[in-house]
Protein backbone atom coordinates (compact mmCIF):
# COMPACT_ATOMS: atom_id res chain seq x y z
CA UNK A 1 0.00 0.00 0.00
CA UNK A 2 1.50 3.36 -0.99
CA UNK A 3 1.67 6.31 1.38
CA UNK A 4 -1.18 8.22 -0.31
CA UNK A 5 -3.53 5.25 -0.04
CA UNK A 6 -2.57 4.73 3.60
CA UNK A 7 -3.23 8.37 4.39
CA UNK A 8 -6.57 8.19 2.61
CA UNK A 9 -7.61 5.17 4.68
CA UNK A 10 -6.50 6.86 7.89
CA UNK A 11 -8.51 9.98 7.09
CA UNK A 12 -11.55 7.89 6.17
CA UNK A 13 -11.32 5.95 9.44
CA UNK A 14 -11.01 9.17 11.43
CA UNK A 15 -14.00 10.68 9.63
CA UNK A 16 -16.05 7.57 10.40
CA UNK A 17 -15.00 7.72 14.06
CA UNK A 18 -16.01 11.37 14.33
CA UNK A 19 -19.34 10.63 12.64
CA UNK A 20 -20.07 7.83 15.13
CA UNK A 21 -19.12 10.10 18.00
CA UNK A 22 -21.41 12.84 16.71
CA UNK A 23 -24.24 10.34 16.29
CA UNK A 24 -23.73 9.01 19.82
CA UNK A 25 -23.75 12.54 21.20
CA UNK A 26 -26.95 13.41 19.35
CA UNK A 27 -28.62 10.26 20.70
CA UNK A 28 -27.51 11.16 24.21
CA UNK A 29 -28.81 14.72 23.88
CA UNK A 30 -32.17 13.42 22.67
CA UNK A 31 -32.28 11.10 25.69
CA UNK A 32 -31.50 14.04 27.98
CA UNK A 33 -34.19 16.19 26.38
CA UNK A 34 -36.72 13.44 27.01
CA UNK A 35 -35.50 13.05 30.58
CA UNK A 36 -35.89 16.81 31.06
CA UNK A 37 -39.56 16.26 30.21
CA UNK A 38 -39.51 13.58 32.94
CA UNK A 39 -40.41 10.75 30.59
CA UNK A 40 -40.09 7.62 32.77
CA UNK A 41 -38.36 5.44 30.17
CA UNK A 42 -35.73 8.12 29.51
CA UNK A 43 -35.03 8.57 33.22
CA UNK A 44 -34.81 4.80 33.59
CA UNK A 45 -32.36 4.56 30.70
CA UNK A 46 -30.11 7.21 32.25
CA UNK A 47 -30.12 5.21 35.48
CA UNK A 48 -29.22 2.00 33.60
CA UNK A 49 -26.33 3.71 31.81
CA UNK A 50 -24.81 5.71 34.63
CA UNK A 51 -25.42 3.80 37.87
CA UNK A 52 -22.83 1.05 37.06
CA UNK A 53 -20.36 3.66 35.80
CA UNK A 54 -20.64 5.85 38.89
CA UNK A 55 -20.53 2.79 41.15
CA UNK A 56 -17.25 1.64 39.57
CA UNK A 57 -15.78 5.16 39.58
CA UNK A 58 -16.65 5.54 43.28
CA UNK A 59 -15.54 2.08 44.36
CA UNK A 60 -12.11 2.45 42.78
CA UNK A 61 -11.57 5.50 44.99
CA UNK A 62 -13.36 4.48 48.19
CA UNK A 63 -12.75 0.69 48.33
CA UNK A 64 -16.10 0.39 50.11
CA UNK A 65 -19.01 -1.17 48.20
CA UNK A 66 -21.71 0.33 50.42
CA UNK A 67 -20.28 3.84 50.16
CA UNK A 68 -19.89 3.42 46.40
CA UNK A 69 -23.52 2.36 46.09
CA UNK A 70 -24.62 5.28 48.28
CA UNK A 71 -22.64 7.71 46.12
CA UNK A 72 -24.06 6.25 42.90
CA UNK A 73 -27.62 6.39 44.23
CA UNK A 74 -27.17 9.96 45.48
CA UNK A 75 -25.65 11.10 42.20
CA UNK A 76 -28.49 9.64 40.13
CA UNK A 77 -31.06 11.22 42.45
CA UNK A 78 -29.34 14.59 42.09
CA UNK A 79 -29.18 14.14 38.31
CA UNK A 80 -32.95 13.58 38.17
CA UNK A 81 -33.66 16.51 40.49
CA UNK A 82 -31.45 18.96 38.59
CA UNK A 83 -31.49 17.61 35.04
CA UNK A 84 -33.39 20.67 33.83
CA UNK A 85 -30.26 22.71 34.71
CA UNK A 86 -28.13 20.85 32.19
CA UNK A 87 -27.57 22.86 29.01
CA UNK A 88 -25.36 21.45 26.28
CA UNK A 89 -22.47 23.80 25.46
CA UNK A 90 -20.05 21.33 23.93
CA UNK A 91 -19.41 19.31 27.08
CA UNK A 92 -21.08 15.87 27.12
CA UNK A 93 -23.86 15.04 29.55
CA UNK A 94 -21.67 12.27 30.99
CA UNK A 95 -19.05 14.81 32.06
CA UNK A 96 -21.77 16.72 33.94
CA UNK A 97 -22.80 13.50 35.73
CA UNK A 98 -19.22 12.61 36.66
CA UNK A 99 -18.59 16.13 37.96
CA UNK A 100 -21.48 15.62 40.39
CA UNK A 101 -19.95 12.29 41.44
CA UNK A 102 -16.49 13.79 41.90
CA UNK A 103 -17.87 16.61 44.06
CA UNK A 104 -19.75 14.13 46.25
CA UNK A 105 -16.62 12.04 46.75
CA UNK A 106 -14.60 15.15 47.62
CA UNK A 107 -17.28 16.16 50.16
CA UNK A 108 -17.20 12.66 51.65
CA UNK A 109 -13.42 12.80 52.08
CA UNK A 110 -13.71 16.20 53.75
CA UNK A 111 -16.31 14.90 56.21
CA UNK A 112 -14.13 11.90 56.99
CA UNK A 113 -11.13 14.11 57.55
CA UNK A 114 -13.08 16.30 59.96
CA UNK A 115 -14.11 13.21 61.91
CA UNK A 116 -10.55 11.83 61.71
CA UNK A 117 -12.06 8.51 60.74
CA UNK A 118 -11.37 6.66 57.54
CA UNK A 119 -13.25 3.43 56.99
CA UNK A 120 -11.97 1.11 54.29
CA UNK A 121 -13.65 -2.13 53.34
CA UNK A 122 -11.72 -4.24 50.87
CA UNK A 123 -14.43 -6.85 50.32
CA UNK A 124 -16.43 -7.07 47.12
CA UNK A 125 -20.13 -7.90 47.49
CA UNK A 126 -21.23 -11.15 45.88
CA UNK A 127 -24.98 -10.58 45.92
CA UNK A 128 -25.15 -7.84 43.30
CA UNK A 129 -27.12 -8.45 40.14
CA UNK A 130 -26.03 -8.24 36.54
CA UNK A 131 -25.25 -4.48 36.48
CA UNK A 132 -22.30 -5.05 38.82
CA UNK A 133 -20.90 -8.30 37.44
CA UNK A 134 -18.59 -6.60 34.97
CA UNK A 135 -17.53 -4.12 37.66
CA UNK A 136 -16.59 -6.99 39.97
CA UNK A 137 -14.39 -8.53 37.29
CA UNK A 138 -12.60 -5.24 36.77
CA UNK A 139 -12.09 -4.74 40.48
CA UNK A 140 -10.42 -8.12 40.90
CA UNK A 141 -7.16 -6.58 39.78
CA UNK A 142 -5.92 -5.71 43.27
CA UNK A 143 -2.45 -4.66 42.10
CA UNK A 144 -3.93 -2.02 39.82
CA UNK A 145 -6.19 -0.72 42.57
CA UNK A 146 -3.24 -0.55 44.93
CA UNK A 147 -1.15 1.27 42.34
CA UNK A 148 -3.84 3.95 42.01
CA UNK A 149 -3.14 4.94 45.62
CA UNK A 150 0.31 6.19 44.57
CA UNK A 151 -1.13 8.73 42.13
CA UNK A 152 -2.13 12.28 42.95
CA UNK A 153 -5.87 12.90 43.08
CA UNK A 154 -5.91 14.61 39.66
CA UNK A 155 -3.81 11.82 38.10
CA UNK A 156 -6.15 9.19 39.54
CA UNK A 157 -9.20 11.06 38.23
CA UNK A 158 -7.72 11.24 34.73
CA UNK A 159 -6.86 7.53 34.67
CA UNK A 160 -10.29 6.45 35.93
CA UNK A 161 -12.26 8.78 33.67
CA UNK A 162 -10.13 7.99 30.61
CA UNK A 163 -9.60 4.25 30.83
CA UNK A 164 -12.37 3.00 33.12
CA UNK A 165 -15.14 5.27 31.83
CA UNK A 166 -13.96 6.13 28.31
CA UNK A 167 -14.30 9.93 28.51
CA UNK A 168 -12.28 12.01 26.07
CA UNK A 169 -9.82 14.72 27.17
CA UNK A 170 -12.33 17.54 26.68
CA UNK A 171 -14.87 15.85 28.94
CA UNK A 172 -12.23 14.98 31.55
CA UNK A 173 -11.04 18.59 31.57
CA UNK A 174 -14.60 19.68 32.30
CA UNK A 175 -14.99 17.16 35.15
CA UNK A 176 -11.77 18.06 36.98
CA UNK A 177 -11.66 21.75 36.08
CA UNK A 178 -8.35 21.68 34.19
CA UNK A 179 -7.28 22.43 30.61
CA UNK A 180 -7.02 19.71 27.96
CA UNK A 181 -3.25 20.25 27.92
CA UNK A 182 -3.12 19.65 31.66
CA UNK A 183 -5.18 16.48 31.23
CA UNK A 184 -2.68 15.13 28.67
CA UNK A 185 0.22 15.91 31.01
CA UNK A 186 -1.54 14.31 33.98
CA UNK A 187 -2.29 11.21 31.91
CA UNK A 188 1.35 10.85 30.87
CA UNK A 189 2.66 11.25 34.41
CA UNK A 190 0.02 8.89 35.79
CA UNK A 191 0.88 6.14 33.31
CA UNK A 192 4.60 6.48 34.09
CA UNK A 193 3.85 6.24 37.82
CA UNK A 194 1.52 3.26 37.33
CA UNK A 195 4.08 1.37 35.26
CA UNK A 196 6.72 1.94 37.93
CA UNK A 197 4.41 0.92 40.77
CA UNK A 198 3.20 -2.22 38.99
CA UNK A 199 6.77 -3.13 38.02
CA UNK A 200 7.99 -2.70 41.60
CA UNK A 201 5.12 -4.81 42.96
CA UNK A 202 5.53 -7.50 40.33
Predicted segments with their positions:
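Internal acidic/polar
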Residues: 11-17, 24-25, 115-137, 141
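Amphipathic, Lys/Arg- and hydrophobic-enriched alpha-helical face
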Residues: 12-16, 47-65, 82, 98, ...
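Sigma70-family region 2
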Residues: 36-37, 60-65, 74-91, 111-113
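Structural recognition of an alpha-helix C-terminal capping motif at a helix-to-coil junction
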Residues: 70-77, 91-103
